[in-house]
Amino acid sequence: MLPTMMTYIEEEPTALETILREHRHSLAAIEAFARERPVQRLLLLATGSSFNAALCARDLFERRYGLRVEIKEPYNFVHYETVDPHTDLVIAVSQSGKSASTLAAMEKVQAAGLPVFALTSDPQSPIGKVSDYVLDINTGIEQVGFVTRGFSATVLNLLLIALTLARAQKQIADEEAQATLHQLSQLAAVIPQAIAQTEAFFDRHQATLQSGTRFVAIGYGALTGVAKEFETKFTETVRVPSSGFELEAYMHGPYLEANAQHVMFFIEDAPDRRLRALRDYMASAVNQTFLVTLSEAQDPQTLALNFPLEHDLASLLLIVPMQVLAWRTACAKGIDLSVRIFDDFDRVLKSKI
């Protein structure tokens, strides 16, 4: 039987545990690099879901470990931007390892004399071969184009890279590193519960989601990456207009689009007064406002995972409901995701190698 998008979502707990167990080996090259020279400024080259994964992970680098991270879209970087000579480390993120724009961005950085690490699911891919150091995401290649397991694995690897850099440069004690790893292991273990909770939530609200013609997700901080990946997954699978916004950015114009057809998701780790105030305000203007939270709640319009996490780790769990809802909503709308569309797109547009 061919795997589906849901097959890979259900494999996430095992995949993440494997990454956690083997990360000292799979990330050995970046640990050795950081032991030889100081690393304080990083450049991440990523597009699509890889860009969203970088948004999810950046908070851990910056707020917890004091490592400055710039995230650049490769095409724009190649044609319209310059290489910052103060950059200490460059990581090109591409699950397939075939992104033509990411490859071009790597070559631009290397021409400026900066070494490039490639974080990819295929070390033998074009990007893996061109990189100076290759880091295996350690999940293999998904046979479904709408990546889920690979997305979560990319987020986890980026979080572990942040921890590895901090540990290699003695910015944290081993006890703190072990505590974070334990939290991540606990997080992986509750993913089956999060999947079940989301399935029940979908069953309660199937009519609303099945008939939805415009979807919007809103997050903040690291959860902006979750909202943006919601946008990517719903656009790819549900195939109606779908957007993900940072909380404050939504308040500066996009709210004016709201109408009675909109279905909105508000994403939080812990109760957030500003996010909830926006949800309350928008409730009368749109079809439905849902809250997705790591805290407890009895409200039937709230998907409460009841598993508190620090903000900089929360995206790794909160992305799971977005993935499940994309799959279930697409299926409810009768979309057969096993049927490829725009099959010649990459060949004609040369977006992938």
For the regions a protein language model found, what residue spans apply to each?
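Peripheral docking tails and interdomain loops at the edges
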Residues: 304, 308-353
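Predominant activation on well-ordered alpha-helical scaffold segments within soluble catalytic domains
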Residues: 6, 17, 55-58, 62, ...
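Short, well-ordered loop/turn and helix-capping segments at boundaries between secondary-structure elements
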Residues: 167, 240, 270, 288, ...
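Active-site phosphate/pyrophosphate-binding segments
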Residues: 2-39, 133-135, 141-262, 334-353
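Glycine-rich phosphate-binding loops that contact phosphosugars or nucleotide phosphates
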Residues: 26, 35-186, 220, 255, ...
